[in-house]
Amino acid sequence: MKIRIPDQKKAKNLEKIKWFFITAIFITSFFINNFFDKIGYFTRISIITLLVVFAISIALYTKKVKNVFVYINASKNEMKKITWPQYKETLYTTFIIISVTILISLLLWGLDSIIFRLIAFIISVRF
């Protein structure tokens, strides 16, 4: 079923109104916390919590949040399709990486020592 153009404009305007109310609610909760410090702490926190819950409940019906939930579900389905390596394969791969790292570091250390001694020899012969 295709949505007609006036319905699309109406839906777009409704989204804008929802986001305006969400923003207004969060700004109101900020002002309540900062400017009504004479009110008791528990009362202030209760009001702010109710406002935040109300803003979140409005946000759950916006198109962007619905798209986020669709993306999360698609990600979960993709995670199920992945073939994860077994513990033994992971352990062997880790040992190979550690061994190659140690081997390369020893080769570089040896090459550095040879170059250092060669340069020291050249400098000592020259002077």
Curated annotation (Swiss-Prot):
<feature type="transmembrane region" description="Helical">
    <location>
        <begin position="17"/>
        <end position="37"/>
    </location>
</feature>
<keyword id="KW-0812">Transmembrane</keyword>
<keyword id="KW-0472">Membrane</keyword>
<feature type="transmembrane region" description="Helical">
    <location>
        <begin position="39"/>
        <end position="59"/>
    </location>
</feature>
<dbReference type="GO" id="GO:0005886">
    <property type="term" value="C:plasma membrane"/>
</dbReference>
<keyword id="KW-1003">Cell membrane</keyword>
<feature type="transmembrane region" description="Helical">
    <location>
        <begin position="95"/>
        <end position="115"/>
    </location>
</feature>
<dbReference type="GO" id="GO:0065002">
    <property type="term" value="P:intracellular protein transmembrane transport"/>
</dbReference>
<comment type="subunit">
    <text>Component of the Sec protein translocase complex. Heterotrimer consisting of SecY, SecE and SecG subunits. The heterotrimers can form oligomers, although 1 heterotrimer is thought to be able to translocate proteins. Interacts with the ribosome. Interacts with SecDF, and other proteins may be involved. Interacts with SecA.</text>
</comment>
<keyword id="KW-0653">Protein transport</keyword>
<keyword id="KW-1133">Transmembrane helix</keyword>
<dbReference type="InterPro" id="IPR001901">
    <property type="entry name" value="Translocase_SecE/Sec61-g"/>
</dbReference>
<comment type="similarity">
    <text>Belongs to the SecE/SEC61-gamma family.</text>
</comment>
<protein>
    <recommendedName>
        <fullName>Protein translocase subunit SecE</fullName>
    </recommendedName>
</protein>
<dbReference type="GO" id="GO:0043952">
    <property type="term" value="P:protein transport by the Sec complex"/>
</dbReference>
<dbReference type="InterPro" id="IPR005807">
    <property type="entry name" value="SecE_bac"/>
</dbReference>
<dbReference type="Pfam" id="PF00584">
    <property type="entry name" value="SecE"/>
</dbReference>
<dbReference type="GO" id="GO:0009306">
    <property type="term" value="P:protein secretion"/>
</dbReference>
<dbReference type="GO" id="GO:0006605">
    <property type="term" value="P:protein targeting"/>
</dbReference>
<keyword id="KW-0997">Cell inner membrane</keyword>
<dbReference type="InterPro" id="IPR038379">
    <property type="entry name" value="SecE_sf"/>
</dbReference>
<keyword id="KW-0813">Transport</keyword>
<dbReference type="GO" id="GO:0008320">
    <property type="term" value="F:protein transmembrane transporter activity"/>
</dbReference>
<comment type="function">
    <text>Essential subunit of the Sec protein translocation channel SecYEG. Clamps together the 2 halves of SecY. May contact the channel plug during translocation.</text>
</comment>
<keyword id="KW-0811">Translocation</keyword>
